[in-house]
């Protein structure tokens, strides 16, 4: 006999959500968003978003197109600064320091918070020079140091075995999936603390997607990862926590398993069961 979730007057679904709230409360916070709004000119795109991104976990942002998930992701390393008329109100604290404070070194911030985009964007250089690009910008040119960085970054991106004999060939000769893993290697070569992935698999075939998903799982032992995805199955597979956004607002944020199986908000349930989106 199926038991009612309100057995003996106890709301079991609420108990489950309380348990996951406790789990989140125990996590070390990498990125704290105490209240963030964002405007493009007069148009408001984000409305008082409040959340804590846990350290060395994978957090996924889901929601329909235009809901603000990529906009929010890009606030974490101030990529929105490059958009004319963009204005942010509020704060984002990276390990306790507000990245929007006056005098923030944005170049250093973007080293600490690396970003991988939807479409693989290798530079028209050799595989080797792609990986060391950020290191050379930092003034690191010692061959031994660069050689070591290339090997560990490519190993870290699960690409070394496929390219170790062609490091001095053009990166443009790689497949789409290999190019995306190369971009991840280039990003981790400068030793960031956070990786932002903006739909990193949307341009890839299923086999390449699986390799990138496996890589994300491996990388979270060293990095805090935030991924935007249109693919709810992908969010369920790779993330520890999921945030559902709708029309610029954070509707629900919590443990991925709980959010997908026992959402607190009807709006979340409607989205994940395909009623809209």
Curated annotation (Swiss-Prot):
Its EC number is 7.3.2.1. Keywords: ATP-binding, Cell inner membrane, Cell membrane, Membrane, Nucleotide-binding, Phosphate transport, Translocase, Transport. ATP binds at residues 63-70. Coiled coil: none annotated. It is found in: Cell inner membrane. GO terms for molecular function: ATP binding; ATP hydrolysis activity; ATPase-coupled phosphate ion transmembrane transporter activity. Residues 31-272 form the ABC transporter domain. Part of the ABC transporter complex PstSACB involved in phosphate import. Responsible for energy coupling to the transport system. This is Phosphate import ATP-binding protein PstB 2. The gene is pstB2.
């Amino acid at each position: 006999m199926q038991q009612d979730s309100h057995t003996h007057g106890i709301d079991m679904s609420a108990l489950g959500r309380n348990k996951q709230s406790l789990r989140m409360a125990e996590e070390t916070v990498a990125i704290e968003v105490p209240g963030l709004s964002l405007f493009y000119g007069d148009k408001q795109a984000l409305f008082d978003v409040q959340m804590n991104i846990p350290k060395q976990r994978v957090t996924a942002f889901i929601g329909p197109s235009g809901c603000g998930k990529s906009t929010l992701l890009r606030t974490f390393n101030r990529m929105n600064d490059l958009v004319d008329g963009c204005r942010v109100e509020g704060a984002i604290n990276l390990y306790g320091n507000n990245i929007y404070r006056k005098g923030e070194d944005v170049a250093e911030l973007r080293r600490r918070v690396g970003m991988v985009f939807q479409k693989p964007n290798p530079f028209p250089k050799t595989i080797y020079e792609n990986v060391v690009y950020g290191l050379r910008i930092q003034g690191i040119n010692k061959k031994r140091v660069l050689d070591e960085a290339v090997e560990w970054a490519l190993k870290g991106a699960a690409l070394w075995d496929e390219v170790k004999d062609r490091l001095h060939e053009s990166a443009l000769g790689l497949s789409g999936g290999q190019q995306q893993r190369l971009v991840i290697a280039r990003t981790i070569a400068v030793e960031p603390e956070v990786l932002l992935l903006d739909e990193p698999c949307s341009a890839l075939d299923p086999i390449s997607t699986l390799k990138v998903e496996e890589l994300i799982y491996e990388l979270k032992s060293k990095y805090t990862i935030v991924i935007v995805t249109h693919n709810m199955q992908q969010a369920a597979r790779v993330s520890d926590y999921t945030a559902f956004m709708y029309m610029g607002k954070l509707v629900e944020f919590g443990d991925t398993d709980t959010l997908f199986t026992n959402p607190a908000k009807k709006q979340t349930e409607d989205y994940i069961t395909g009623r809209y989106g």
